[in-house]
UniProtKB/Swiss-Prot annotation:
Function per UniProt: Catalyzes the phosphorylation of the position 2 hydroxy group of 4-diphosphocytidyl-2C-methyl-D-erythritol.
Highest taxon in the source lineage: Eukaryota
Cofactor: Mg(2+)
PANTHER family associated with the record: 4-DIPHOSPHOCYTIDYL-2-C-METHYL-D-ERYTHRITOL KINASE, CHLOROPLASTIC
NCBIfam families xref list: ispE
Main localization category: plastid
Cellular compartment(s): Plastid, Chloroplast; Plastid, Chromoplast
Protein name: 4-diphosphocytidyl-2-C-methyl-D-erythritol kinase, chloroplastic/chromoplastic
GO biological process terms, semicolon-separated: isopentenyl diphosphate biosynthetic process, methylerythritol 4-phosphate pathway; terpenoid biosynthetic process
GO cellular-component term (any): chloroplast
């Protein structure tokens, strides 16, 4: 996308040597998204073009210079690069599943207490952070439609929280490459927030401890503190009380995630939840059994399944069909969080009916595995992790002007 050409008056008819700079912008080489540029143009700097001004000495000639408005952002980013020790950072933002989820009581504040084994898995988003010269606003872009890009997004909330807690004044260009579906019970937004807090702390020279980041994060979301564990945790309270544990599950156990196009409203699921009809099994006994005997159908209890199946009856049918069609290939089939993702642990392959039935032509499918992270490092995407099939891509972003 080029602006109208700029004309200069030239009175010297001699050969004139002009610098022609053609800028192509993409997320791989500059900190802000610009998917609307022609991707066939190559990135060339300082290439020269010779222009002749013909005619009489006294005639005035016009010389055409190609100009791209993105040049000003290139210069700003280069200036930031020179002045800052860390100016760009790309991080993996993995999601989680609830291997079991017990709702243990209703609190006076209207929330419910839970007890759950949270575990990070290999499906995740990528978030690219770049320092912005702005001192007043973050700029967020993403590759999918329907994701809010303003203060409703947990990424922006996390940056505002970090600045409030630390007094730092860094603002960012952020691009979210989204692969985790929304409304899935996988904690994708919570992971984005935790990843953002960790990134902001890196840019500020780690002025906060991870423990502080974890405590602060509970102010903007109950599931966010979990991601500051090492990847496996027994979580209680609203989910913000995190007990880091060694992973009780071998990392080589595969799984498949199946999410229908319809999402479950978490608020509606909890509204329909009836405590007196929920499971009475001791959650610590579930954790102990998983640690000693591994995952099985009887330990993957989710008290939110009955109300979620009321909200979305087709989800119950999907779970039943996966169990029946699996014929023992899955160690357990269960819903994660408040839905609407059905998880089949034990095989990376979905049952054939998901491909054959018209009803499931729009489902999200992904294989995944359990992962953790080393101390003082963030999560790293495994090379083998993949999403089954092509997912539709869109592009939206803030105006960079």
């Amino acid at each position: 996308l080029w602006l109208p050409v700029i004309f200069f008056v030239v009175s010297n008819p001699k050969l004139i040597l002009l610098k022609r700079v053609v800028f192509f912008q993409s997320w791989s080489n500059r900190p802000h998204g610009s998917s609307y540029f022609n991707k066939n143009i190559q990135f060339r700097r300082n290439s020269f073009v010779i222009v002749k001004a013909s005619g009489s000495r006294t005639s005035k000639k016009q010389v055409e210079i190609t100009y791209n408005p993105e040049e000003k952002f290139n210069k700003l980013a280069d200036e930031v690069d020179r002045e800052a020790g860390l100016s760009r950072l790309t991080l993996f933002s993995p999601c989680k599943i609830n291997v079991f989820l017990r709702i243990t009581s209703k609190r006076d504040d209207g929330y419910h207490d839970l007890a759950s084994l949270f575990h990070v898995i290999s499906l995740g988003d990528k978030i690219k952070f770049s320092l912005s010269p702005s001192k007043s606003k973050d700029r967020l872009s993403t590759n999918v439609a329907g994701v809010p890009l303003d203060e409703r997004n947990l990424i922006i909330k996390a940056l505002n929280l970090y600045r409030k807690k630390t007094g730092t004044d860094n603002y960012f260009w952020i691009h979210l490459d989204k692969k985790v579906p929304t409304g899935a019970g996988l904690g994708g937004g919570s992971s984005n927030a935790a990843t953002t807090l960790w990134a902001a702390n890196q840019f500020s020279g780690c002025v906060a401890t991870e423990k502080e980041l974890q405590e602060w994060s509970g102010e903007i979301g109950s599931d966010i503190p979990f991601f500051f564990s090492h990847g496996a945790a027994y979580c209680t309270g609203r989910g913000e009380v995190v007990q880091d544990i060694p992973s009780p599950i071998p990392f080589d156990i595969p799984m498949v995630l199946i999410k229908p196009q319809q999402a479950c409203s978490t608020a509606e699921v909890y509204k329909r939840f009836q405590l007196d009809l929920s499971s009475k099994v001791d959650p610590l006994s579930l954790l102990e059994k998983i640690s000693t005997s591994g995952i099985s159908q009887d330990v993957c209890v989710n008290d939110l399944e009955p109300p979620a199946f009321e909200v979305l009856p087709s989800l119950k049918r999907l779970k039943q069909r996966v169990i029946a069609a699996g014929r023992g290939q899955y160690d357990a089939v269960f819903m994660s969080g408040s839905g609407s993702t059905i998880v089949g642990v034990g095989s990376p392959d979905p049952p054939q009916f998901v491909y054959d039935d018209e009803e499931y032509k729009d489902v999200f499918l992904s294989e995944a595995s359990f992962i953790t992270r080393p101390a003082n490092e963030w999560y790293v995407e495994p090379v083998s992790g993949s999403t089954i099939g092509d997912q539709p891509e869109f592009s939206t972003s803030f105006d960079m002007s």
